[in-house]
């Protein structure tokens, strides 16, 4: 096994010296709308040295935070010229002479944010990467470091949940929402999802229930529902908000005494309004969560390793799938960016750049 890994590094290094790698990257030199500022640029990459790893990107999703970063609306401000994207799954091509934990052919994902993943090839440091089993699907691996981890941490870090407890969330069809449903199913937790009404509401409800949602209600239905008062489900002790405005207020209204509302997004761009009654008489707490901060503070922590291990085990077992998505060729990145900017792109479908097309 050791000899095979050693030969793999030697052969890969020889291949690297014989063939120059030209990366096609989506770069931008100023903030603005992605369709306007992103350019497909070719660059020759250097051979990996020391602790560096050369990878071929296989698939990279377009997340709301990626769009906001390009627009200049996100707290993370990359240096120009910058390559878009934070997530991906890649294949190791070759490694530097001091790399010990990686070899050619392995699948990896980025552990650090802001590396720039909308590119066909890249050179990263070995401590910026995590090996992923090839049993994990490309779409699952490519979308594993933002939405599943956000759902995991919010379910673990704010309220000590037990099987049979209930969680309620708006934006239940978002990528994080879909991840919440699946984790709740795996852990025996009831998951109540709230979505906007739409012509295809029956199909949407069925899709979310297949993922693990216990109940899916529209914003109008939740206002008159008796699922909690009747005792059908326990009152939620934990709520997730990615919409804001009236939707967040309605979600908080259903929390049990001492419940916690966690806000991780604001798609409506309306502020979270705290109702006085629940705040005083039910001692409701309002918290915020940002996965990027948690990852930086826990970069090498055992808890982070445990989280990825659990998520990937569920993926390998077929108990956790990628969000509803569409694979898009890199050449059509402008169409994908425009679609991702739409409300549907934020809540209905994930667009993933397919670097193999």
From Swiss-Prot:
Active site (record annotation): 74
UniProt keyword list: Fatty acid biosynthesis, Fatty acid metabolism, Lipid biosynthesis, Lipid metabolism, Mitochondrion, NADP, Oxidoreductase, Transit peptide
The organism's place on the tree of life at top rank: Eukaryota
Tissue expression notes: Expressed in the central nervous system.
Domain Enoyl reductase (ER) positions: 36-352
A Pfam short name: ADH_zinc_N
Residues that span the membrane, as ranges: none
Substrates-to-products reaction catalysed: a 2,3-saturated acyl-[ACP] + NADP(+) = a (2E)-enoyl-[ACP] + NADPH + H(+)
EC number: 1.3.1.104
Oxidoreductase as UniProt keyword: yes
GO MF annotation, one: enoyl-[acyl-carrier-protein] reductase (NADPH) activity
BP term (GO), one: intracellular iron ion homeostasis
Positions of NADP(+) binding: 147, 173-176, 196-198, 264-267, 289-291, 349-350
Compartments, as annotated in UniProt: Mitochondrion
GO CC list: membrane; mitochondrion
Phenotypic consequence of gene deletion: Larval lethal. Larvae have increased iron levels, which accumulates in brain neuropils. Larvae show increased levels of ceramides and some phospholipids due to dysregulated iron homeostasis. Larval muscles have decreased mitochondrial membrane potential. RNAi-mediated knockdown in neurons produces age-related climbing defects indicative of neurodegeneration. Neurodegeneration phenotypes can be alleviated with drugs that reduce ceramide levels or by reducing dietary iron intake.
Residue range covered by the transit peptide: 1-19
Function: Catalyzes the NADPH-dependent reduction of trans-2-enoyl thioesters in mitochondrial fatty acid synthesis (fatty acid synthesis type II). Fatty acid chain elongation in mitochondria uses acyl carrier protein (ACP) as an acyl group carrier, but the enzyme accepts both ACP and CoA thioesters as substrates in vitro. Involved in iron homeostasis; affecting Fe-S cluster assembly and ceramide metabolism. Required for proper morphology and bioenergetic functions of mitochondria. Required for maintenance of neurons, including photoreceptor neurons.
Subunit structure of this chain's protein: Homodimer.
Family classification: Belongs to the zinc-containing alcohol dehydrogenase family. Quinone oxidoreductase subfamily.
Protein name: Enoyl-[acyl-carrier-protein] reductase, mitochondrial
Species the sequence originates in: Drosophila melanogaster
Taxonomic path: Eukaryota, Metazoa, Ecdysozoa, Arthropoda, Hexapoda
């Amino acid at each position: 096994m050791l000899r095979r890994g050693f030969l793999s590094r030697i052969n890969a290094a020889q291949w690297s010296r014989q063939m120059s790698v030209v990366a096609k990257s989506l770069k931008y030199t100023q903030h603005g709308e992605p369709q306007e500022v992103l350019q497909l640029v070719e660059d020759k990459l250097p051979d990996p040295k020391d602790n560096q790893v050369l990878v071929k990107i296989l698939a990279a999703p377009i997340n709301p935070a990626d769009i906001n970063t390009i627009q200049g609306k996100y707290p993370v401000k990359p240096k120009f010229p910058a390559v878009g994207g934070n997530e991906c799954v890649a294949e190791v091509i070759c490694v530097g002479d001091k790399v010990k934990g990686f070899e050619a052919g392995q699948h990896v994902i980025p552990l650090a944010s802001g590396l720039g993943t909308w590119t066909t090839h890249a050179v990263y440091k070995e401590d910026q990467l995590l090996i992923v089993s090839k049993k994990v699907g490309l779409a699952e691996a490519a979308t594993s470091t933002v939405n599943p981890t956000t759902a995991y941490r919010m379910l673990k870090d704010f309220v000590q949940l037990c099987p049979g407890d209930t969680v309620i969330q708006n934006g239940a069809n978002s990528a994080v929402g879909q991840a919440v449903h699946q984790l709740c199913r795996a852990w025996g937790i009831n998951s109540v999802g709230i979505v906007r009404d739409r012509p295809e509401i029956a199909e949407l409800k069925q899709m979310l229930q297949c993922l693990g949602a216990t109940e899916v209600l529209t914003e109008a239905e939740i206002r008159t529902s008796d699922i909690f008062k009747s005792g059908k489900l326990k009152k939620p002790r934990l709520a997730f908000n990615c919409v804001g405005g009236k939707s967040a207020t309605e979600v908080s209204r259903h929390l049990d005494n001492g419940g916690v509302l966690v806000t991780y997004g604001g798609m409506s761009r309306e502020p979270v309004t705290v109702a006085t009654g629940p705040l005083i008489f039910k001692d409701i707490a309002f918290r915020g969560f940002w996965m990027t901060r948690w990852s930086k503070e826990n970069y090498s922590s055992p808890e982070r390793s445990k989280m990825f291990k659990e998520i990937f085990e569920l993926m390998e077992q077929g108990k956790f799938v990628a969000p509803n998505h569409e694979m898009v060729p890199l050449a059509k990145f402008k169409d994908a960016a425009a679609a991702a900017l739409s409300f549907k792109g934020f809540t209905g479908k994930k667009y993933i750049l397919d670097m193999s097309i």
